[in-house]
Amino acid sequence: MNGTEGDNFYVPFSNKTGLARSPYEYPQYYLAEPWKYSALAAYMFFLILVGFPVNFLTLFVTVQHKKLRTPLNYILLNLAMANLFMVLFGFTVTMYTSMNGYFVFGPTMCSIEGFFATLGGEVALWSLVVLAIERYIVICKPMGNFRFGNTHAIMGVAFTWIMALACAAPPLVGWSRYIPEGMQCSCGPDYYTLNPNFNNESYVVYMFVVHFLVPFVIIFFCYGRLLCTVKEAAAAQQESASTQKAEKEVTRMVVLMVIGFLVCWVPYASVAFYIFTHQGSDFGATFMTLPAFFAKSSALYNPVIYILMNKQFRNCMITTLCCGKNPLGDDESGASTSKTEVSSVSTSPVSPA
């Protein structure tokens, strides 16, 4: 084995030289230079500095403006809430541990930090699944003129948290475990060992199949069918121009969110799967650290995409920030068809704003 395994950790560094130490008790500067830990701390500070206000503002603006409280927006707000959990209970801890060069808070806090990081990522993924299903039902109409209402949205939100907990909670109760990963200043599921006391192998297989592959199969199926339906509707002119434009705007926004998730999380999942299937092989600490920390940027892109692509929300946000006035003078009633209320329509024309 080219690493050092302890009771609650695995350091990707052989202890033949006697340098390897517990990541809960000693700085891990033998894994990487101190400036790299400082760079990670600065990066986490940036994510906190931007991620908290952007996600909090998304929630606050929606509460302030009743017109934004549409069924589809419930799912988008769910994403913002999950991101806030990651920022408050994950990023703050990781920033401090990076500043110290090791996980100073001990194994219990490592489990908590790993839990919230996994929970936030899974809520985001399953929220994208719900959005994909909603787009598929509304546009492809496999259930006829189905209306996606508040009850369905609430059920969708509850579903995302149930599935996320089904992924994030098992390591807390003995099925696998959370340990420091990479440069040992952030925590995640144990992909590194086959410790029989924790059944890591079965958990990792379960997580990759149920909580990674299945969601993406659903997402790609829904958007594949959706693309065909949109092309057919455009060719047959079955919907009004405003309806088609409205549905396309919302769909484009959700597709961008899916692409953003792929860009952020696929590198991490790929490296984790490689480590799991090549346990004991030689790899550097930064090999897992870079994709793990890059995945944390997912807390930023969803609200940014939402703000940039939804003119009605953008106008409401500007009005809130400017104490009830919009200096840009944009008329919300003439806003782009990006209004997310289109999710509640069937075959009736869609108001562009």
UniProtKB/Swiss-Prot annotation:
Short name of one Pfam family: 7tm_1
Motif 'Ionic lock' involved in activated form stabilization: where in chain: 134-136
Membrane side Cytoplasmic: residue ranges: 62-73, 134-152, 225-252, 309-353
Extracellular-side segments: 1-36, 97-110, 174-202, 275-286
Modified residues (N6-(retinylidene)lysine): 296
Keyword Lipoprotein tagged: yes
Site (Plays an important role in the conformation switch to the active conformation): 113
Subcellular location: Membrane; Cell projection, Cilium, Photoreceptor outer segment
Disulphide linkage map: 110-187
Chief location category: membrane
Region (Disordered): 330-353
Keyword tags: Cell projection, Chromophore, Disulfide bond, G-protein coupled receptor, Glycoprotein, Lipoprotein, Membrane, Palmitate, Phosphoprotein, Photoreceptor protein, Receptor, Retinal protein, Sensory transduction, Transducer, Transmembrane, Transmembrane helix, Vision
PANTHER family given in the database record: OPSIN (PTHR24240)
Protein's job: Photoreceptor required for image-forming vision at low light intensity. While most salt water fish species use retinal as chromophore, most freshwater fish use 3-dehydroretinal, or a mixture of retinal and 3-dehydroretinal. Light-induced isomerization of 11-cis to all-trans retinal triggers a conformational change that activates signaling via G-proteins. Subsequent receptor phosphorylation mediates displacement of the bound G-protein alpha subunit by arrestin and terminates signaling.
Protein name: Rhodopsin
Native species: Lethenteron camtschaticum
